[in-house]
């Protein structure tokens, strides 16, 4: 690995500064410095030199520091991990004495990390290495990092070029693909009358002649049998105009293929009738579950997605002319049945999803093993021993409910993605992954110190499951580009799986190919029936507004509300999230407590979790409850804070955002990390100026200073100052609040709707279905490798955790 930036400093007039700075790091207490540590240390160095920190454009050393992700202090040398560009990493050892640069390999870096935590034992043999790179060597690969996350666009270009370069083979593939589609025993698209690709081309032209004399709006049922005699079955369209348009696209594709024509044609093929979404953990339901442990944005995401998916699928099937077959989509969300459901419907096998025709929550119980464990909710960190048998049982249930195998399986989060892998492998269907959040990037050093964290988090299982599922998936949906490969100054969630060590367990030399076309950025939407601008007064219910206004500001109910407001007329500073460490509501409360300027202008209102530790069985939630009380007392926030420990129905949460907006309040999302940020979309579309964490998805939702603001939740004073600056601007110009409010609403409506999301998702599923059918890529070797990791790494550790559960 060439260390270009490091070499440039060594060969420049800043060489002495580099040596002096390196010497300071060498003598410091920290052996492992992350980017923030490095930037702070460099700022201290510049201050000691009585000069400002130079911008990266003006100093080679400053540029090196800016692009350095980690420094490991190792006796007489420093190991520099530099990320000069997105998705590219360089590792070098710098000898402090004479500034000699020695490039390092990834295995050498992983050994060094092991040595740092005293888990390096070369005399006992090598550690197992995971390397998936050989399985991607013969697959098409994106070249430019800017195009990562645009996998389907790349794939369309690749496929259309193959159609052009090798027309005979690829026309045969397309012909074979058109012949395989059926619905409930009915042949679709083409029948046995069309005998070859050449014959297909001839019959398409003949069909276009037949249709040319018919009125464009004539229904398909009127000419169905005439087309059938030419070899065409249902699936081309519902009117003359639609059928003609689809056949013209196919004609163009056969004669002069290009990527846009290919996507337009494949996205019209009726091939998706049954979709299974997998989300085992938490309390998956429609009422009384949000705010429970492990139950939040993912549940909202999936339910909203399903409603929009069904609507889009119905529309697509109708446009395809499958009304003559009475074709209807069916969607199932597969989750876990929890026998002790605590008043929810999570012990009910089937639950119809509101607002749909044929979409259901299907709950399958974990096998019993130890009833003291399996009869109750199980933390997402403890769920791993039950997933394989859950997948076996769920396969039978899915077949029974669908009457068929699903056409597409969508996994959600680490556990759902692993089950999706097991099911897709058994059922031989397309697998899509949605991570929502990869825990490895949320918990600092979670892989390096996995053994210390194992009792609580079981990361050895989760990270192994992630590696298996992400490599096995046919395609992966991420909400943002940075979820895959980060930003110029921070690594992405998937990028963090490229190489890492699990000391004494395994080394990941190459864990994922970031340039694979399997990655696609498809942001979610927001439910516009529930969340809409505060000034849409005719859509708001006055009774709800009055009830919730009292709940937020004045109601005395110690069972579910803590705190009172001495001056309820102050501008509300609002946040709503689960009470866990990563969501960091205690950080917001402490920032509020430290800032007199915020307290003078605002009241803090939190909707979060429970009020009493006795009511929670979640360790993180209990710790955060205790911490929040301690902060309230430490900073004497009595009379300035309201903490509502309640679970709100979705409709109430929508109205609460609007009530806060009525009072020209603001919304703060202070998470230490947020994969996407649905609450940010909900707040913005409601009209609330929104402050979102700069760590994660909000970086792509919010445009800083235009339609919201970034905050750094690790610097509490800075976070408070950012909010205060906006409030001061509002004091100077009352229109400032309106400006940000309006811009936030426009941002959501232009980019984050479920219709955009679902249209894209269905198109992706069809393109990847065609790719898997027609390409010569053999994934079987990759899949066998993933199965080996499952059986040899994952399963023994899952069985050990199960043995532990049996003793409880």
UniProtKB/Swiss-Prot annotation:
Catalyzed reactions per annotation: an NDP-alpha-D-glucose + D-fructose = a ribonucleoside 5'-diphosphate + sucrose + H(+); ADP-alpha-D-glucose + D-fructose = sucrose + ADP + H(+)
Region annotated GT-B glycosyltransferase, chain positions: 271-753
GO BP terms in the entry: sucrose metabolic process
MF term (GO), any: sucrose synthase activity
EC number: 2.4.1.13
InterPro entries hit by this protein: Glyco_trans_1, Sucrose_synth_GT-B1, Sucrose_synthase_pln/cyn, SUS_EPBD, SUS_N
Complex and partners: Probably a homotetramer.
Similarity annotation: Belongs to the glycosyltransferase 1 family.
Protein name, as recorded: Sucrose synthase
